[in-house]
């Protein structure tokens, strides 16, 4: 079913209004007005019928309020929401904006190599934002530009998209913020905008964020340690140190230790990490763990030694911090 352009919606509204107006005029009781001649009545009735037919034709092509099937990025038929999709790289324009998009993609996939002065570990943006930042249920960036500026409970104020990106640099990348007006910051925002080209403004695509887990579950860290050894250590190492090539690039990223994110990162929170694990881990086997197993594993590895985020006491200034926030 196709989305009707705004102008057609306006025509429909005007048509319905016209029908109502004709009906009201025909029913008005004005003793000073002579009765409408039969021929005029017939003409008025014909106009009403014509308007009704046009209105029905428009309504038959108009989707329900949540029907987004005309989205170019694809649609999840169950939810009616647009789906996450990496646009074809051939659509990147051959101009200054396109150059910024390509730079943003390069930074996203090779962050600590491209920006060594801003990254304090050996991770990339796409260590968590999988698939070039465009994989469903791996915190994809598709449509991210349309939700910022936005209120952040963690900072207690409105944040711009640039400030949100810098939050990741200071926490997930254990590094330093980019200059808000730098070419590299603009490149990252440009890349996110390009990713979002097929997304309707203000609509959360199917696959945004992470999968949901039951946050009422109490973690069993001992079981998490056992499961980590069985299901996670083969890639991430016995202590979460990851596997790295001689040139410093990783085969599997560190999820603990100095090469990993600090304790102020979202991924250092038990239930946030559990949501990522449930949807995407073990690698290639996402969805194979129960909520309880994901929570147990997350509780174990998020509390392994890792860098300490300075000034965490200033987070959540209004006292509404989730229970898994590190202090």
UniProtKB/Swiss-Prot annotation:
Major location category of this protein: periplasm
Source taxon at top rank: Bacteria
Pfam families: Cytochrome_CBB3, SoxA-TsdA_cyt-c
Catalytic function, reaction form: 2 thiosulfate + 2 Fe(III)-[cytochrome c] = tetrathionate + 2 Fe(II)-[cytochrome c] + 2 H(+)
Listed EC numbers: 1.8.2.2
Signal peptide range: 1-26
Gene inactivation effect: Cells are unable to produce tetrathionate from thiosulfate.
Known partners and oligomeric status: Monomer.
Biological function: Catalyzes the oxidation of 2 molecules of thiosulfate to tetrathionate.
Protein name per UniProt: Thiosulfate dehydrogenase
Encoding gene per record: tsdA
